[in-house]
């Protein structure tokens, strides 16, 4: 994100989690910016907060941002930075779940289609070419 923020100190304690030395119960909901029109992002985040949640988890699908090899797009509906900033402003913690592979009933697990054009590459494997 473009602004520097103070990161919270998260500790796993014997009886739970503490954040900045305070015991916390994490209530987390999944909010996927890539399935919601940008105009509704703030509304959905606010509703989650109003329902008592204090955290979101969000996938960041690789193939949503890199449609063609080397062609990254983080504008408009793909502006994940703006989405994450809205979550922070709503008072929500974030569990970011970037690819390369995601579940969430997403085509190809969010792996870019161009990967299938490379002969001999074994996808989702220890293949050095894939890992590069």
PLM regions: where:
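The substrate-binding groove and active-site-proximal loops of carbohydrate-active enzymes
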Residues: 26-37, 62-79, 117-132
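Active-site region of glycoside hydrolase catalytic domains
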Residues: 3-7, 13, 89-92, 102-132
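N-terminal carbohydrate-binding accessory modules
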Residues: 1-55, 85, 93
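Aromatic-lined substrate-binding rim segments of carbohydrate-active enzymes
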Residues: 42-115
């Amino acid at each position: 994100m473009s602004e520097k923020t103070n990161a919270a100190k998260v500790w796993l304690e014997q009886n739970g989690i503490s954040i900045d030395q305070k015991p916390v119960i994490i209530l987390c909901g999944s909010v996927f910016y890539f399935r919601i029109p940008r105009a509704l992002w703030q509304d959905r985040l606010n509703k989650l907060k109003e329902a008592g949640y204090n955290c979101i988890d969000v996938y960041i699908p690789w193939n949503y941002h890199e449609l063609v090899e080397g062609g990254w797009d983080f504008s408009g509906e793909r502006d994940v930075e703006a989405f994450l900033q809205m979550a922070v402003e709503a008072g929500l913690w974030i569990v970011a779940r970037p690819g390369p592979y995601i579940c969430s009933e997403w085509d190809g697990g969010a792996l870019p289609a161009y990967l299938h054009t490379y002969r001999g590459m074994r996808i989702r494997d220890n293949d050095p070419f894939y890992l590069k």
